[in-house]
Regions:
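Fungal secretory targeting signals
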Residues: 1-23, 645
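Soluble FAD-dependent oxygen oxidases
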Residues: 22-645
């Protein structure tokens, strides 16, 4: 029997029988145990020891930066081989090669494969199934893209991790965490790589890839200690929206999850809050969580729910991914399947002129409050194209609404468009189920391009309650489009009451918001690093500052935010940040887990090789002390201002 196989069998045999409240998947029963570590040679045991048993070797924790592959104290090839042998499968440890390496001179260059890859490069599925790719490639450092998209001259790892563990068991995750912590290696977590800031990448890191933890269990009547009794679904960390929605539909229920097909629901999405086509009906995805299974920074596998690790449970529901631990599964509430009516329409300025075009857009803005008061969700874009502009609704999504009810909601807007002589050809469809509607109506979201940065803002209901407020907010959005920037927007209202009045870490700005708006800034693909930095700063301090100015005291959605967001602690969590920081210090005082703009990330920074904000560089400490950070956070507990109109 091989060493890794014996460790799996021993760990499984030593696991106690779980209580009814802790139903574990098979892969969660395969765990690393102290009993097994005690059988290893001392040198090997030290590599994989749990935190409370580990005595740091000299200088292992004294360095300013996490060790990098060209450092003398980077783990030896022998150490990496030992890690690979301990994992639950012989191929679990991956030394990654970028997909686009087939396009560059080298041993795997293949022009046919390069052509095929390039043709499918913007398809998100191309990147989701890869252990290292992310959907915001600008944060990888652009060191290996297909040359016709971005020619880097050669192909290097850049911001991709040096090693990846294809996690198939809790054992794999525990070994990865312990190895990285004990050897001073940067650790990152990748599920699907959707995060707008590139949190799933990291040069010189060991990455834990949770994408293949796909188990799903349905409970017809789940009895939770929180008082909830009803249907529920437990899903592995790697389960994506298209898989979760299908499983729910098969059992006649719906769950609160993302609109994007490829989003890894139980990873950073739900930990960051998670907005949904059902948010105006059932709140944020995080509001519907009943419990997490998680491996913490010490290597311990534990539960976080209403009765166990309650502080961690609070933090994981909205506090963000990549910083508190590695979630292996999540149990969420489910609701009865429902019919949905959806509508789509579009118009542009080509034949009607910009004045009438903007009057048509404003006509929809005037109905924001009415729409969300009826539990609807609108997903629309406003796109400049040269001298013209296009408004596209795809879709207006009305859960549990008949065709007539949805039509009546939209008729005032459509009547205004008719009065303005703006022609539209709306498509209005009633579906028998949420799943059918979601499949038919939401487009597949592509990978972002290589010369764009995004930012977002939550616009509160108060901004749209008066004519003056609507004018101010609409003006800020219009100015961005007139400056050449696309707007991607969501009209929804995940109010606290909609989510069942939970106490969790979700950004309080969400509770008063009825518009989540995203925009981006492009630059020339051949721009120098200095020009890119100038464009980024202009975007952050220009367009996004105008949005902040008209929404004082509000915030931004951390999963879809500007990486350079100023005062991000307040923007992502408001007055909840001080509590989150305390929980981070309690569960991960050594910052084993780090991600940009994550809770507790202030003490570290990526020193990128090109000086740009990306993951292509060493992770190093900065001079700011925790006490300084904490005192600044306390100031955030004071009430924040609102726009008075």
């Amino acid at each position: 029997m091989t060493l890794f196989a014996s460790s799996v069998l021993l760990a499984a045999s030593l696991l106690s029988v779980p209580s009814q409240a802790r139903t574990l998947f098979k892969y969660e029963r395969i765990q690393l145990t102290q009993e097994y570590l005690d059988t290893l040679p001392q040198e090997d045991a030290q590599l994989f020891a749990f935190e409370d048993k580990f005595v740091a070797a000299p200088n292992k924790t004294a360095t300013r930066c996490r060790y990098f592959p060209d450092d003398g104290k980077w783990p030896s090839d022998k150490a990496w081989t030992k890690l690979g042998k301990q994992l639950s499968s012989v191929d679990a440890l991956i030394k990654p090669v970028p997909q686009a390496a087939v396009c560059y001179p080298g041993p795997i260059q293949d022009d046919v494969k390069c052509k095929q890859l390039t043709a499918n490069w913007t398809n998100s599925y191309t990147h989701i199934s890869d252990p290292t790719e992310i959907l915001s490639p600008v944060y990888q450092g652009l060191t290996c893209q297909p040359p016709t998209i971005y020619n880097s001259g050669n192909c290097t790892l850049g911001g991709y991790p040096s090693y990846v563990i294809n996690a198939k068991t809790v054992l794999d995750i525990q070994l990865g965490i312990n190895f990285a912590r004990n050897d001073g290696v940067r650790l990152v977590i990748k599920n699907t790589g959707h995060d707008f800031a590139g949190k799933s990448a990291g040069a010189g890191s060991l990455s834990l890839w949770t994408h293949n933890l796909k188990d799903i269990t349905f409970f017809d009547k789940y009895v939770d200690d929180s008082g909830y009794t009803g249907p529920a679904i437990k899903a592995g960390a790697g389960v994506q929206a298209f898989e979760l929605y299908k499983a729910a539909s098969d059992h006649g229920v719906v769950v609160v999850a993302g609109e994007g097909q490829t989003v890894g629901v139980m990873g950073g999405y739900i930990q960051g809050g998670g907005h949904s086509p059902l948010s105006s009906l059932y709140g944020m995805a995080a509001d519907n969580v009943l419990g997490f299974e998680i491996v913490t920074a010490t290597g311990e596998f534990t539960t976080a729910n209403s009765t166990n690790n309650q502080d961690l449970f609070w933090a994981l529901r909205g506090g963000g991914g990549g910083t508190f631990g590695v979630v292996t599964s999540v149990t969420v509430k489910a609701y009865p399947e429902m019919p949905v009516t959806a509508a789509s329409w579009s118009f542009d300025s080509t034949k009607i002129g910009k004045d009438r075009f903007w009057a048509g857009v404003r006509a929809y803005v005037d109905h924001f409050i009415d729409n969300v008061s009826n539990s609807t969700y609108s997903y629309f874009t406003i796109s400049p194209n040269g001298n013209d502009v296009t408004f596209r609704m795809q879709p207006f999504f009305a859960p549990n609404k008949t065709l007539n009810t949805a039509s009546n909601l939209l008729q005032p807007h459509w009547t205004t468009l008719t009065r303005l002589n703006i022609p539209i050809n709306p498509k209005l469809t009633q579906y028998k189920s949420f799943y059918d509607a979601w499949q038919a109506e939401f487009p597949l979201e592509p990978q972002s391009d290589v010369q764009t940065a995004f930012g977002s803002r939550l616009f509160p209901r108060s901004n749209f309650e008066s004519e003056t407020g609507r004018n101010i907010s609409f003006g800020a959005l219009k100015d961005s489009v007139n400056a050449g920037q696309i707007i991607i927007a969501f009209n929804m209202a995940p109010a606290l009451a909609r989510g069942g009045n939970p106490d969790n870490a979700v950004n309080p700005a969400w509770r008063n918001s009825i518009l989540h708006a995203i925009t981006g800034r492009r630059w020339d693909v051949k721009s120098s690093a200095n020009d890119i930095l100038a464009a980024r700063k202009s975007f952050t301090n220009g367009t996004m500052q105008k949005w902040r100015d008209v929404t004082p005291g509000s915030g931004s959605y951390l999963n879809e935010a500007d990486r350079l967001e100023p005062n991000w602690q307040q923007s992502f969590w408001g007055n909840k940040y001080a509590k989150l920081l305390g929980i981070k210090r309690n569960y991960d005082p050594k910052d084993v887990f780090w991600a940009v703009n994550a809770v507790g990330s202030e003490g570290w920074t990526v020193e990128s090789f090109d000086g740009l904000p990306n993951e292509n560089g060493r992770l190093c400490m900065v001079n700011e002390t925790i006490s300084t950070t904490t005192s600044r956070m306390r100031a955030m507990e004071e009430p924040t201002p609102v726009m008075v109109v």
